[in-house]
Amino acid sequence: MKIIRAKDYKDMSRKAANIISAQVIMKPNCVLGLATGGTPGGAYAQLVDWYNKGDLDFSEVTTVNLDEYRGLPKEHPESYWSFMHKNLFDKVNIRPEAIHLPDGTNPDAADACKKYNEIIHSVGGIDLQLLGLGPNGHIGFNEPGEAFELETHCVDLTPATIEANKRFFDGNEDLVPKQAYTMGIKTIMQARKVLVVANGLAKAKAVKAVVSGPVTPECPGSILQMHPDCILVADEEALSLL
């Protein structure tokens, strides 16, 4: 795993965006695996800025997202579909038909997961997968204890994840979806390149476990030590325990 040090969140975001933009420039018809949440947002803002300056072209890019809440309509302001459109897709020239997320509105979990796996395979797999990192080392919604050999699957959100996400639902955890569809560890590990972003002291223990701890399902991100082309971009606080 290659580690790139950043001074702060802004620097981390720029360095991560540099890696993503290099992938798009090198292979204009690449497949990007994308993530949601607070950590990748700055990188998306930087990509939009470069697009507006004429430095990036997304017209041939295909995207597949890591995860989506189960049971939320696409148009719900807290769906990951909405997050991605608000932060990236509506601001660049990506083709609508080239945007893929798990279908959170499909009540048949097995069917939703099967169809998403088929989409990922049909586009030729993922060239670059962007990941955030949970404080407990989770990637996507793959929580501690998840089997490494899973592809897209339906998960029950842990109480800690529901608690962490209630801030997006007016502080009311009753409004937070209790399940989600997520790419599995197997799918993530099949990406040709993986880019992990982490910032802040709250992520320091997870970063240490992911980089130098034992490879174990109890820290899902630790499997990335086995990936042949994984880059971690993190700020000084997130790297403070290394």
Which residues does each predicted region cover?
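N-terminal glycine-/serine-/threonine-rich phosphate-binding loop
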Residues: M1-L32
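Glycine-rich N-terminal segment of FAD-binding domains in flavoprotein oxidoreductases
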Residues: M26-N52
